[in-house]
Regions:
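Extracellular/cell-surface secretome signature
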Residues: 152-154
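Short beta-strand-centered aromatic/proline hotspots
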Residues: 77-86
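Acidic, glycine-rich low-complexity segments with interspersed aromatic residues
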Residues: 1-74
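A generic structural motif
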Residues: 21-23, 90-99
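Sequence contexts marking disulfide-bonded cysteines in secreted/extracellular proteins
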Residues: 141-148
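Hydrophobic residues positioned within well-ordered beta-strands of beta-sheet architectures
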Residues: 68, 80, 92-94
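Helix-rich interaction surfaces within compact, conserved domain-sized segments
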Residues: 2-5, 95-136
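Exposed beta-strand and adjacent loop surfaces of beta-rich binding modules
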Residues: 65-67, 79, 116-118
Length: 154
């Protein structure tokens, strides 16, 4: 399980098939990965590590898009499938599958501007056995920074 939380964000329709959920990198308040039981570990995940993990391996999110739930501060929920992730120096953008993107609390989708959005990402990637892969992806993404030590819990 991954949890990505920001202080603000937006939903934009980008075509017949997709929406995008975007927020400024500066608005990111938490990005956390949890392992499955029995290990029950958790890790802070810097944006560059999340981006590196997106395409890493045969079971990557790029190869098998994850299910997700997006919640805004009013408690409304939207179920979606994440089909893309782009992180640059300014923003984090997830691509949402249109057919899966729907609100379960009302007839309308979440509003265009979101306050305190939280994205819950379902993942079989982060099992106890997958921790080594997480650390490898983190090491590659963080080679030039100190965030690798954070992945190790230092």
């Amino acid at each position: 399980l991954f949890v990505v939380e920001a202080s603000s964000g937006s939903i934009t329709k980008t075509g017949d098939e997709t929406h995008e959920f975007s927020f400024p990198v500066s608005a990111l308040t938490a990005a956390i990965a949890f392992t499955d039981r029995p290990a029950r570990r958790s890790f802070d995940v810097p944006p560059n590590v999340l981006a590196a993990m997106w395409d890493a391996g045969k079971d990557s999110f790029a190869a098998s898009p994850p299910n997700a739930v997006l919640e805004d501060d009013s408690g409304r929920l939207a179920i979606t499938e994440l089909t893309g992730l782009v992180i640059d120096t300014e923003s984090v953008t997830f691509t949402l599958d249109r057919n899966a993107y729907r609100s379960i609390d009302s007839d309308d989708a979440l509003s265009h501007e979101l306050t305190n959005p939280t994205l819950f990402i379902d993942s079989s990637l982060i099992t106890a056995a997958g921790v080594a892969g997480l650390l490898r992806a983190g090491a590659q993404a963080c080679a030039a920074s100190e965030c690798y030590l954070a992945l190790l819990g230092a």
